[in-house]
Each structure stands twice: as C-alpha cells, then as structure tokens.
Amino acid sequence: MKIILATSNKHKVLELKEILKDFEIYAFDEVLMPFEIEENGKTFKENALIKARAVFNALDEKQKKDFIALSDDSGICVDVLEGNPGIYSARFSDKGDDKSNRDKLVNEMIKKGFNQSRAHYVAAIAMVGLMGEFSTHGTMHGKVIDTEKGENGFGYDSLFIPKGFDKTLAQLSVDEKNNISHRFKALELAKIILKILNKG
C-alpha cells in the first residue's frame, strides 16, 4: 500500500515522512499536478477529510487501487484568544505566512493585556481510500509566550512551550518534538488503522 500526502507544505511533508517511515510515502506533487483545495470545513477533522477526499478523487482508477490519501489539518488554540486562531492557524494574518501569523498572535495576546497564555495544538489525520474514510486526533497542551525562541520547526513552534518543558518546540530536536507532538499522537493512531488496512 502506498500513501499520498494531501499537502504541499514541505515542512509537513518532511515531518509526516519521518513519522510514517515504515510506509511508502509520496508527496502530493510527486504523483499529481498541484491544484488548489478549498478548506471550508468548520473543524480540523472536516478540513482534513476535505483535503484527503480531493486528492484521492484526483487519482486515476489504477492509482486508487494502490494509494490511500492521507491528510493532516492542524492548528493552535489559544485560551486568551477564545480558541483562536484554531482552524485558521495557517492563514491567521492577511499575508498567511508563518512569521506574519506568529506576529499577529503575539499582537492579539498583548492587546488583551497578556504576555503568555495557556494553549493547545490539535491535529486531525484523515485517510481516504477504496476501503473507506478514517480519521484520528491528537493534542498537545502547553502555553504560548510573546517572544520567539529557537530555530527549529515551523508555524507557531517558536512561541509554544509544551507542558512539562521549559523550551519552545523550536528549541527541541526533531526527535524530541516528534515524540510529544499532536501530529505524532494522531499519526500513531493512524498507523494502527493503516496496518490493518494493509493486511486487508
């Protein structure tokens, strides 16, 4: 069984390939011509399923027998921002790039009079294939701070300190991050489903 990742985000592709290294993984643009997918769901799970369905439906009939489309939708929910940016994490600012998104998060927090806040990451993994549709979830709790620290990672990693740590995700090694991340937890559950489907 082959897995096609329903993302063109290079950081996510690397992270997903590392965690799913027991499987034959292909990035979206290694198999298909890139196309835009409108993420108009109201939850992480809905958006993950929208992306996985779109990629699976773009495969030809032969490819559909060989591939399962796997998608991740994830984001950060900040308590003092009433759970925002949530599903809009990747496009929180007008520019929609990581730095602008982080800057907006910090500015919104400071506007409310806070220099840190409890927060959590959520990841939803969706898998779509001829055998059906499946999804898993993972969370990671901690806090966001108002000063970026660390060079690793992407997204909001340089602002997020996981519970039980005194470093941001961007200060942790890839292995340290992968062992505690929301995406890792959701993918560990997804791997169980994928192994069962592979036997079937």
Curated annotation (Swiss-Prot):
State the Gene3D superfamilies in the record: 3.90.950.10
Per UniProt, the enzyme's principal EC class comes to hydrolase
**Active site residues of this protein:** 73 (proton acceptor)
Q: Which GO terms describe its biological process?
A: nucleotide metabolic process; purine nucleoside triphosphate catabolic process
- The positions annotated for binding Mg(2+) are 38, 73
What assembly does the database describe for this protein? Homodimer.
Q: Which family does it belong to?
A: Belongs to the HAM1 NTPase family.
Q: What is this protein called?
A: dITP/XTP pyrophosphatase
Question: What lineage is on file?
Answer: Bacteria, Pseudomonadati, Campylobacterota, Epsilonproteobacteria, Campylobacterales
